[in-house]
Amino acid sequence: MSWQQRIDTALATRRAADALRTRRVVEQGAGRWLTVGDSRYCNFSSNDYLGLSQHPAIVRAWQQGAEQYGVGSGGSGHVSGYTRAHYALESELAEWLGYPRALLFISGFAANQAVIAALTGKEDRIVADKLSHASLLEAASFSPAQLRRFAHNDVSQLAALLDKPCDGQQLAVTEGVFSMDGDSAPLAAIAEQVRRAGAWLLVDDAHGIAVTGHKGRGSCQQQEVKPELLVVTFGKGFGVSGAAVLCSEAVATYFEQFARHLIYSTSMPPAQAVALSAALSVIRGEEGDQRRTALAGLIQRFRHGAAALPGRITHSQSAIQPLIVGDNSRALSLAERLRQKGCWVTAIRPPTVPAGTARLRLTLTAAHQPEDIDRLLEVLHESGE
């Protein structure tokens, strides 16, 4: 089979399954409203959970950072791209989350791949929740380490896998809040089994940081767990982009030597780091508390109104509120009907989620108003979902 035949076959298979991914050009895609051409929609597909992407102080911080540093870092942090702005943000994150060190990465995907690739060898074992993010599972599958996956949030199966003989070290991998189901990992129970086995724990808290826990410190603080490796990302609750790995001093120094995504990537623009420091100030302050409280109220408003919907909602208490509809074409059709009614919703289909669980991934943000939630519920009820 030629290269072109291989590509054509793969695309035809996706089209036949109503699983072909496409992108839409939007004029404005973050915040309460999404604009496509001349049409405006209430946006229920954004990960901007606290509504910070449009925050005036954070926007100004980025502008001021660009005026001071320019628009790019100019190189890897190991060469010339590690500025005072990067150092300040790392220091603030480490102090906020109670770790000796924080290391910045250009994305959560890069951070997860770097950590697993740098740490694990052929005698090691990675034990990962089967619903962990693609960045984690891909890195684990590419690693020379043995990969074993446990049933979603099944602590007993995790413990059984950790108990199996291993010539090297073991790394348990999970998320704080899962991106597709919106549910939380039982981190305290997981951490107990990891400690008992003498393993290490990696928690990706992309969807929990800034949104949950005291002063937004995330899922681990909320459940009183301190993993050896905590990955936080900035494209959700922070409203920006990028990521950081929180760890010990020795592990940070190790990553500075062996984490290839850190060493060989141009570091994030310094202006972005300035904006992230401004976002952190909002998140950990009184305004952050107010936004989290507002978001929690909207989540409960939605769940109360969605209880009577025919589609299956999960037990999620997070900003991610999936409506499981099952069939790919049905999910696509429902998403289109909602858009026709002014609600921008995205259908999520396999292979992103398991077969037979196509869904509308509804995301709520602190930028929404109660009337937005009421309108969404009204449209869902009208659509028979």
Swiss-Prot record:
Pathway linked to the protein: Cofactor biosynthesis; biotin biosynthesis
Source organism (scientific name): Pseudescherichia vulneris (Escherichia vulneris)
Keyword annotations: Biotin biosynthesis, Pyridoxal phosphate, Transferase
EC number(s) from the headed UniProt entry: 2.3.1.47
Domain of life: Bacteria
Name of one Pfam family that matches: Aminotran_1_2
Gene3D superfamilies: Aspartate Aminotransferase, domain 1, Type I PLP-dependent aspartate aminotransferase-like (Major domain)
Positions with a binding annotation for pyridoxal 5'-phosphate: G108, F109, S179, H207, T233
Physiological role: Catalyzes the decarboxylative condensation of pimeloyl-[acyl-carrier protein] and L-alanine to produce 8-amino-7-oxononanoate (AON), [acyl-carrier protein], and carbon dioxide.
Subunit structure: Homodimer.
Family: Belongs to the class-II pyridoxal-phosphate-dependent aminotransferase family. BioF subfamily.
Lineage of the organism: Bacteria, Pseudomonadati, Pseudomonadota, Gammaproteobacteria, Enterobacterales
Entry's Gene Ontology molecular function annotations: 8-amino-7-oxononanoate synthase activity; pyridoxal phosphate binding
Gene Ontology terms: biological process: biotin biosynthetic process
Protein name: 8-amino-7-oxononanoate synthase
NCBIfam families named among the record's database cross-references: bioF
Catalytic activity, as annotated: 6-carboxyhexanoyl-[ACP] + L-alanine + H(+) = (8S)-8-amino-7-oxononanoate + holo-[ACP] + CO2
